[in-house]
Each structure stands twice: as C-alpha cells, then as structure tokens.
Amino acid sequence: MLPFEAIRRSVEVSTVRGQLKVGVSYDEFIRIIKLLVSLVEVDEAWYMRQYEDVALAIREGIFASPRAHFASNGYLEGRMPFPILVDEQWYLEQNPDVAESIRRGEVLSAQEHFNQNGYREGRLPFPP
C-alpha cells in the first residue's frame, strides 16, 4: 500500500474558510492514481480474453503483463481489472435509462450494460 506520507508530500494543503483543501496538478493527480491502481489485483487470464488488443500488445512486447497494462493505461481507459457482478435490481433503479434500453431491446441486462458501458461511464454496479 502506498504510504499516506508519500501522497501527502505530493499535494498542496491549504485552509480555505476554516476547511483544509488539497490541491494537486493534473499530472501529479494521474501519477498518484497510477500508483494506487498498480496495487489492484488483475485477473490476468480474464483481462486478456476481455481485451484482445491488450493480449496482442503483450504478445508484441509493448506491455509486460495485463497488470502492467491496467496500471499504466487500462484504468484510465475505463477497463475493468476483473469481472464485477452487478446488483441488477439496484442498478436498474439507479439507472432508469438502462432499464429503458433493456425494454427497447438495446441491451439484454444491467450486467451487459455495465460491462459494455457502465463501468467506463463511472456507474456503480451495486450500492456503495
């Protein structure tokens, strides 16, 4: 785990109207995110099956592993590191547009929507 102190040194802390505020450059923000994401467990076999372009890039030596791709690019591209099970009822309650898409036959399920678009769009798969 990345030590808190390592992150704290990377940001500017100030007080605004009695509240602590944290400021960071975009480049530093991305660096911190990549460090944190590098700690995520990646289901490497699933990742290679799910993302054929990544499998090709690994075979060509562009990336060392699925985990390396996820940490450097995949997370920022909105790729999932492993299969994530969706709470169908909750997801549809939170996302009426998805329920409507299912009704119209555009997607088969909340799970399919989440896998294809929802994760990348920042939708939650189950209650926080």
Q: PLM features: residue spans?
A:
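Charge-rich, low-complexity intrinsically disordered regions
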Residues: 1-128
